[in-house]
């Protein structure tokens, strides 16, 4: 049986592990192949995320940056990576990942796209 693929896109590895760990484990329990995208990380947090059994993907994103060209570059990078994986679902959280990952997922025709702005 071919498992479905889900991409979870956030910013920091520590945030992904701390706040999305249960969600990741739930997806894995339902036989999803989970790809975790992070833009800020240390080797310690990368190892913790890998230990969950996910495929870890890093990408460039300036969380506080105001350069539209850099953000456009991040969007194109996400488009390329999402196109390679061909997921069934993209779930993003935090402001910039929701904006740019949603555009990238729509551009690559991902069937199910979800974005969650934290704190709302």
Language model region names:
Residues 30, 52, 85, 108-109:
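Helix C-cap/helix->beta junction micro-motif
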Residues 60-89, 99-107:
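An amphipathic, basic-hydrophobic alpha-helix
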Residues 3, 8-70:
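N-terminal strand-loop element at the rim of the active site
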Residues 92-98, 117:
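Short His-centered aromatic/hydrophobic patch
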């Amino acid at each position: 049986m071919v498992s479905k693929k889900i991409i979870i896109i956030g910013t920091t590895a520590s945030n992904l592990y701390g706040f999305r760990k249960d969600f990741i484990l739930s997806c894995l329990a339902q036989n999803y192949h989970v790809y975790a995208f992070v833009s800020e990380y240390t080797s310690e947090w990368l190892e913790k995320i890998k230990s969950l059994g996910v495929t870890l993907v890093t990408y460039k994103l300036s969380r506080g940056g105001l350069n539209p060209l850099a953000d456009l570059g991040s969007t194109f990078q996400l488009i390329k990576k999402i196109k390679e994986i061909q997921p069934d679902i993209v779930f993003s959280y935090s402001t910039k990942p929701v904006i740019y990952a949603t555009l990238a997922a729509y551009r690559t025709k991902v069937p199910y796209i979800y974005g969650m702005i934290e704190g709302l």
